[in-house]
Amino acid sequence: MAAISTCQTVIPLPIPVFFNQQFPTLVDICARWQLVFDADAPFELRFESDTLTLHKRDEPKLDGIVVDFVTGAVAHRRKFGGGRGQSIAKAVGLKQGVTPKVVDGTAGLGRDAFVLASLGCTVIMVERHPVVAALLEDGLRRAYQDAEIGDWMRERMQLFHGSSLEALAKLEQEVDVVYLDPMYPHRDKSALVKKEMRVFQTLVGADLDADGLLAPAMALASKRVVVKRPDYAEDLAGVKPSMVIETKKNRFDVYVKSAMK
C-alpha cells in the first residue's frame, strides 16, 4: 500500500466494526486505525476492487460509502464545476495570485477539501473518527496513484487524524484559512443525502461540540475562518460573521482576521 501523508495525535478508543478477518489487507487497515472486530457491529468495512467501503449492515440495499477523488461526482465537478468562480473558492479567498493554505477541520468524505485542492490550495484534512479517517486515507492512496491527478494530489492534500483543531497547533505550520462544515440536520431528501446522513449520523453522531470549534479555528487561521452552514442554520457559536456568501441551499459564513495577500 502506498505511503499516505497522514499525521495522528491522540490514540482513540478501539472502534468496533465487522470485517472479513481472513482478508490481510482489511486486517492491516483495521489494526492501523484501531478498529476491532465485532460480529454484532452495525458497520462493516469491505475491501473490494482495490477500494475500501463502509456498509451499514441493517440496510443492505444501501451502497457502500467510499472516498473517491478520481471518478464520479467529484471528478465531474473538478472538470466542469466553475473553477475559481465557485462560492467556496470565493469564501476562502481564492483569487489571482492567491492560493491559501487551508485546514479543513471537519473533513468528512473530503469533497470540499478536494475542490479547494483542485483549484490550487494546499489542504490539510482533519478527521477525528478513525473509520472516516481510514476511508479518507484509502481515497488519498488511490488518488496519489492516479496518472491524471496524482502529482498535484500528493503536493496539496494531506490527512491529519486528531480529536480537535487544537491539536493542529502542534504542527507549527502557518495556516491561512480554516474551513469548517459541522454536521447539521439536513432537510434535503435526496437519495444521496439521505444515505450518507443516515450512515454518518449513526457512525459519528451529531457534532454536539461544533460551537467549540470556532475559537480554536480563529486562533489557528491567520487570514479567515469559513463556516459552511445550511441556509436555515444559526450562526456557529452565535457569532455573527464578517460576511456571508449565499448559495441555493447553503451559505458560507466568513470570519475575516486579515486581508488575503
UniProtKB/Swiss-Prot annotation:
GO MF annotation: an example: rRNA (guanine-N2-)-methyltransferase activity
Cell compartment(s), UniProt: Cytoplasm
E.C. numbers: 2.1.1.242
Top-rank lineage group of the source organism: Bacteria
Record-level GO cellular component terms: cytoplasm
Reactions catalysed: guanosine(1516) in 16S rRNA + S-adenosyl-L-methionine = N(2)-methylguanosine(1516) in 16S rRNA + S-adenosyl-L-homocysteine + H(+)
Pfam families, per database record: SAM_MT
Enzymatic class: transferase
Binding locations of S-adenosyl-L-methionine: R111, D112, E127, R128, S163, S164, D181
Keywords, alphabetical: Cytoplasm, Methyltransferase, rRNA processing, S-adenosyl-L-methionine, Transferase
Main subcellular localisation: cytoplasm
Functional summary from the UniProt entry: Specifically methylates the guanosine in position 1516 of 16S rRNA.
PANTHER family xrefs: RIBOSOMAL RNA SMALL SUBUNIT METHYLTRANSFERASE J (PTHR36112:SF1)
Family the UniProt entry places it in: Belongs to the methyltransferase superfamily. RsmJ family.
Protein name: Ribosomal RNA small subunit methyltransferase J
Lineage of origin: Bacteria, Pseudomonadati, Pseudomonadota, Gammaproteobacteria, Alteromonadales
